[in-house]
Amino acid sequence: VLLLAIVSLVKSDQICIGYHANNSTEQVDTIMEKNVTVTHAQDILEKTHNGKLCDLDGVKPLILRDCSVAGWLLGNPMCDEFINVPEWSYIVERASPANDLCYPGDFNDYEELKHLLSRINHFEKIQIFPKSSWPNHEASSGVSSACPYQGRSSFFRNVVWLIKKNSAYPTIKRSYNNTNQEDLLVLWGIHHPNDAAEQTKLYQNPTTYISVGTSTLNQRLVPKIATRSKVNGQSGRMEFFWTILKPNDAINFESNGNFIAPEYAYKIVKKGDSAIMKSELEYGNCNTKCQTPMGAINSSMPFHNIHPLTIGECPKYVKSNRLVLATGLRNSPQREIRRKKRGLFGAIAGFIEGGWQGMVDGWYGYHHSNEQGSGYAADKESTQKAIDGVTNKVNSIIDKMNTQFEAVGREFNNLERRIENLNKKMEDGFLDVWTYNAELLVLMENERTLDFHDSNVKNLYDKVRLQLRDNAKELGNGCFEFYHKCDNECMESVKNGTYDYPHYSEEARLNREEISGVKLESIGTYQILSIYSTVASSLALAIMV
């Protein structure tokens, strides 16, 4: 009787609820655990670049090569290739360009000018004071061996070094009205001689000044005559200045010596997002949507760890080395125990103890076994809802991190080192916060994703349990054992939620009562084991005899 009962139980029809498993070794971290193996994961941290300078959305960068921004704007003779430049997407300057201020000196508010350039995409150079407009001064003699061109002394192309003429330097009074609709970048300078002899040799007047005025600027400069060490063979120095002249405003110059006059000015014809990048890279004849000083990034990932300074549509920079988002389930593949004919599997195939590698068309589903055979079937509805939810997860993370901290790579002069240090600390602090937020968000979302999948499996289990009620027995491993015959049509009704409980309840009741009559517990577990042991021993003894 006991043997018949056991055989009867083994041959009962079953349906199990389970989840997908595969050979994935992808691992994620959660708030509670590290290195959780999952069926599917998505790396959301871009770590690669192409190592090249590329066009940005089809617009070429302005790569200054051996020229600095100052050398380009003033017109260092060695930077003639940049006399007229087309629209640029961003500007690239080397860390220590060779062709800077060929005549030694300073560029006043240079760092602020560079910051201004990070919002400009195109200049149009226009002539405001032609060399021929200085009849009472030498406009071509102001050259220096410090600025050579083709083996001869030369000077910056966009400004004019005015020298005395016929032993006289008449006072200059010149104005320029900006009749353009665009802002105008105007450059000028002052020469600081080495000694009084050089002062009178060049400008005749021993005491000189330069006055510059606009509606917003009131400047008066005087030369600083001093003995200095030679740089580029020069003991003198030059100091350059700039201003933005608004439309309908005028700039007025007055000077009786030492004046470096503007010949050309820059009309700002296009403003937009740009940047000045410090990079030694070469142009790669490529196109990108995101550029860094290390190279271009072509990625749809929400984060990157390549360089904090970027230009274009870029992922958000974080200091993390790893950000992996769980999109699938916990991956714990379980071997199935199959019978030769019907493929019936045992308790270890349940969702509590392991996932199914045989179910490949969904995340959650069923495995059934009856007289007609056995097989897997994904639950398409719950799987699709889960896919939709997880698909939106990356977008959700992007939305939650949609404010990019702007690391513009600002520069500071020597007098602003404390400000620079403070600025760097603030930038580092912001980046630390962004990194912490990104890492914490990923940990939390991974926890939620895995809990979400667990909940979906439980919901599917409860859906079956509530339909079958006492027409089947819960085996405790995600499987139900029917107390009645359940053919393929019956199995399908359980899966789609249309199972007819009353139709099968009488057959189930009779089988349930029959099984109850031979319950193992009526004999006792230890007695059953004892009987089995005795029978096995007797059989072994008989074989030996």
UniProtKB/Swiss-Prot annotation:
Palmitoylated. In natural infection, inactive HA is matured into HA1 and HA2 outside the cell by one or more trypsin-like, arginine-specific endoprotease secreted by the bronchial epithelial cells. One identified protease that may be involved in this process is secreted in lungs by club cells. Transmembrane segments: none annotated. Homotrimer of disulfide-linked HA1-HA2. Disulfide bonds join 16-479, 54-286, 67-79, 102-147, 290-314, 486-490. Residues 1-12 form the signal peptide. It is a single-pass type I membrane protein. Keywords: Clathrin- and caveolin-independent endocytosis of virus by host, Clathrin-mediated endocytosis of virus by host, Disulfide bond, Fusion of virus membrane with host endosomal membrane, Fusion of virus membrane with host membrane, Glycoprotein, Hemagglutinin, Host cell membrane, Host membrane, Host-virus interaction, Lipoprotein, Membrane, Palmitate, Signal, Transmembrane, Transmembrane helix, Viral attachment to host cell, Viral envelope protein, Viral penetration into host cytoplasm, Virion, Virus endocytosis by host, Virus entry into host cell. One of its GO terms (molecular function) is host cell surface receptor binding. The record marks 342-343 as: Cleavage. Belongs to the influenza viruses hemagglutinin family. The gene is HA. This is Hemagglutinin. Major glycoprotein, comprises over 80% of the envelope proteins present in virus particle. It holds the Pfam family Hemagglutinin. It comes from Influenza A virus (strain A/Teal/China/2978.1/2002 H5N1 genotype W). GO terms for cellular component: host cell plasma membrane; membrane; viral envelope; virion membrane.
